[in-house]
């Protein structure tokens, strides 16, 4: 019979020391914590945790070994009005578990009870935590440490990026191993990608609503166990765990000079609202882990049913420990924080919130690339430009301005220029660098670039919500025909805008983020919220990729890396050599001139050598070039023996870059 000794309140979680396992669990309001050990047949042994130090319950299992299955039952008051929902009938996941065995189905036994505790036992249905102890030979792996000024981010989903790649063996497609395959790495290197940003690879589950419809949470933002690698993206090869496979992928990408950023979810948990499953924090210490209203209800500032209370001292440390685990165990180079405003809630947003202070004080984490999605749906949730130094931020104002300028004719050139210059009014005055602006035209959430040019309306019927989900404010333009089938004249305009938007993105000051597939002409058939589509709608179709567009994109990224004004990560100042703003006659734009003349035409001289010519009108135009000898440059022309230009005639919706002869 297993017996627990007192053990130690540290280290946190389940830790194998070579002789046994030390178990710890935080709960400030529990009356008793019971460790539940399971054998291979699922038989359960319950052992009361013998010691408590502060709010940490702990015990040591002599002779315990890696592979031990376990969970917890936590007893205490069931008093929803005070925020307490303890229920020992529910087996609970360790919030720090580093591996889980099993899946969470749509099972009524997970119900914890709304006003009264549900007494059905959930142990048989719940995945079991696994104690793991996996050493790994990193073979001298070092982070690529790409300067922010040279960073080009590529946002991708593990499965969506690799599932249909013809040069990756079928048994590896859709997995972490596929990320390490030479064919995938060659694509990233050919494009010029410096940083791969992966949608969540933390252990996530499918909401009951989706399971009832036969769908899944494809994006992975419904995280249950943030310390655990999701096994759904593992190849299942014998002897290779999901953790090892992810490590192999990171090591291979690092060897190719490519950074890896993980999209992490700490704004809410998979327990959803009061009617959701009791799986972890709700049953461990609901009042400590979640933001609650005065009457004990969940403060749903995320739109996902609950919001994690990241300003609580223990919850803050839980996040810091989790990030350090991913950094140390998987050598990741940074993190993108979903609904990042929640990180700073106290409950109002505060730049000096405990989690921000803890990140800044941690030498290892503060050296990582940290990216925030700067909003949630709560009061005061929109915080673009307000995150502390050390963070970069997804810039939706850049996105909407560039779409509006090129596709709708609704944005004047002054607004275009302000956002082309890394949205300087948002970031420069607050002491941030240009790289703080994560520029994007598209992201996983919304239309793909091609769909932006083919659909005026969203087409999300496959999501099972009668097309109610997804944004209606897309700033798109189908050029007179809804859908992918259109005549040659419409496609000519679409392709011109496709290249114009890519050029704008990759030659703007700030940090560009390219959505995987946009360089290939990937379409989701007008679905702008494909979060539950784990199928060919979201998987990149490499066989039909637009090869010319891929070459065009790669040429743009190479061009970007040559222009000091874009790579030095310093603000452009009036009169310096970084930028000159010119009108269609090649003359400097005065303050008054910005508001006069055609608002969709502009010339931008970068680093005194590269001239960006912009015609966002729906008609051809002629521009007079500034003094000097100008010639075409890839991907806009061939410089060898090229004609020296004094004027440029640009078709509708076009952008071009010329280079000045030495």
UniProtKB/Swiss-Prot annotation:
Database matches in InterPro entries: GlgX_C, GlgX_Isoamylase_N_E_set, Glyco_hydro_13_cat_dom, Glyco_hydro_13_N, Glyco_hydro_b, Glycogen_debranch_bac, Glycogen_debranch_GlgX, Glycoside_hydrolase_SF
Any Pfam family hit: CBM_48
Keyword Hydrolase: yes
Active-site feature positions: 338, 373
EC number: 3.2.1.196
Catalytic activity reported: Hydrolysis of (1->6)-alpha-D-glucosidic linkages to branches with degrees of polymerization of three or four glucose residues in limit dextrin
Sites marked Transition state stabilizer: 445
SUPFAM superfamilies from the UniProt entry: (Trans)glycosidases (SSF51445), E set domains (SSF81296), Glycosyl hydrolase domain (SSF51011)
Pathway the protein acts in: Glycan degradation; glycogen degradation
Keywords: Carbohydrate metabolism, Glycogen metabolism, Glycosidase, Hydrolase
A single MF term (Gene Ontology): glycogen debranching enzyme activity
UniProt-listed GO biological process terms: glycogen catabolic process
Functional description taken from the UniProt entry: Removes maltotriose and maltotetraose chains that are attached by 1,6-alpha-linkage to the limit dextrin main chain, generating a debranched limit dextrin.
NCBIfam families from the UniProt entry: glgX_debranch, PRK03705.1
Family the UniProt entry places it in: Belongs to the glycosyl hydrolase 13 family.
Designated name of the protein: Glycogen debranching enzyme
Species: Yersinia pseudotuberculosis serotype O:3 (strain YPIII)
Lineage: Bacteria, Pseudomonadati, Pseudomonadota, Gammaproteobacteria, Enterobacterales
Gene: glgX
